[in-house]
């Protein structure tokens, strides 16, 4: 039976890998998270480099987060909020409000 008839992706089958799921970093919902983080950084009057210095990271680390090339886990989210001088709760509320608006618009 040819691979095309089995539903197997020929590119991934030949490499011995399973097909990848869509990257959640590029979802509309995660775009909201990124937008809130970028807005909070700008509201704090910080450049990417200045925020990175507060986090003990490189400027490219923050840039990758903001471009959606790196996902933020909960602990890093809390550290970012603290470095911006805002509570993680406040950022989560902003995210929840925008996600609600996104859902209503759909």
Residue ranges of model-derived segments:
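Alpha-helical DNA-recognition elements
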Residues: 64, 68, 79, 97
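Short alpha-helical DNA-recognition segment
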Residues: 45-67
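Residue-level signal for the short linker/turn that defines the boundary of a DNA-recognition helix
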Residues: 35, 45-46, 72-75
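DNA major-groove recognition helix of helix-turn-helix/homeodomain DNA-binding modules
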Residues: 75-90
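Alpha-helical residues within the helix-turn-helix
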Residues: 42, 53, 82
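The DNA-recognition helices of helix-turn-helix-type DNA-binding domains
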Residues: 58, 69, 95-99
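N-terminal flexible/basic segments that precede or flank functional cores
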Residues: 1-44, 87-93, 98-106
């Amino acid at each position: 039976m040819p691979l095309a008839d089995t539903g197997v992706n020929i590119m991934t089958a030949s490499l011995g890998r399973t097909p990848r799921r869509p990257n959640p970093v590029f979802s509309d919902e995660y775009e909201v998270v990124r937008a809130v983080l970028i807005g909070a950084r700008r509201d704090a009057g910080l450049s990417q480099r200045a925020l990175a210095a507060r986090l003990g990271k490189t400027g490219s680390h923050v840039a990758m987060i903001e471009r959606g090339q790196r996902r933020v886990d909960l602990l890093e989210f809390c550290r970012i909020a603290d470095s911006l001088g805002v509570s993680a709760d406040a950022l989560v509320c902003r995210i929840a409000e925008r996600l609600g608006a996104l859902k209503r618009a759909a």
